[in-house]
């Protein structure tokens, strides 16, 4: 890059970061069923098809095009997150069932958590069209405290991922944040909260969680 003039040494420095290999369940480099080299196009298609089957079984009133669009987007997130959530220099096992699961430390789980927030915000806006953003009140429960503290660790997680050339640090952070969110939601029914100030605080809190998750997946490239 220096020799071709693409990079100016005085303005930018390059650093080599080694990456491990994606292996099959047998611990050997991942291959197709016929033993050939696994092409990215084939991998993307396989994961997208796996996600599609799951979406189809719970698709409700979604059209074929909508289900396929969701499968493609979530499938790409599954692969990128699955790859980046591992330590860069280590080999890892590609398990399509684990990578495409909507539970656990996976891309689909992160996407699901974001969709859950958007659904709550949409319902809240429909029920309270004139509502304004509230002040985030001091937390009163452990789950609320855990979520607030997790949000406070965002800058630290980004800095660690950058300085250590380790995107897995950011992946682990958003997984922890998503867990805190879902545990908080399981304990606090936002739509049925009778205290308007608390309800506004909860909505502002999860809106901030969504913003952090969206920023994080943008930084991770999906």
Region roles according to the model:
Residues 1-222:
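Non-catalytic interaction-recognition regions
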């Amino acid at each position: 890059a220096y020799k071709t003039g693409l990079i100016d040494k005085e303005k930018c420095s390059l650093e080599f970061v080694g990456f491990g290999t994606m292996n099959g369940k047998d611990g050997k480099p991942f291959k197709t069923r016929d033993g050939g080299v696994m092409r990215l196009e084939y991998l993307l298609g396989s994961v997208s098809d796996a996600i599609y089957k799951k979406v189809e079984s719970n698709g409700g009133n979604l059209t074929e095009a909508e289900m396929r669009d969701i499968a493609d987007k979530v499938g790409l997130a599954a692969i990128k997150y699955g790859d980046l959530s591992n330590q860069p220099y280590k080999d890892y096992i590609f398990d399509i069932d684990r990578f495409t699961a909507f539970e656990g430390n996976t891309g689909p789980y992160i996407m699901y958590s974001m969709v859950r927030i958007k659904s709550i915000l949409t319902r809240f806006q429909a029920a309270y069209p004139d509502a304004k953003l509230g002040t985030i009140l001091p937390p009163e429960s452990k789950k609320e405290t855990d979520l607030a503290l997790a949000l406070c660790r965002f800058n630290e997680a980004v800095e660690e991922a950058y300085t250590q050339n380790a995107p897995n640090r950011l992946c682990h952070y958003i997984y922890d944040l998503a867990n805190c969110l879902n545990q908080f939601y399981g304990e606090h029914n936002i739509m049925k909260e009778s205290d308007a100030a608390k309800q506004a605080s909860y909505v502002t809190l999860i809106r901030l969680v969504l913003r952090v998750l969206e920023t994080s997946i943008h930084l991770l490239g999906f």
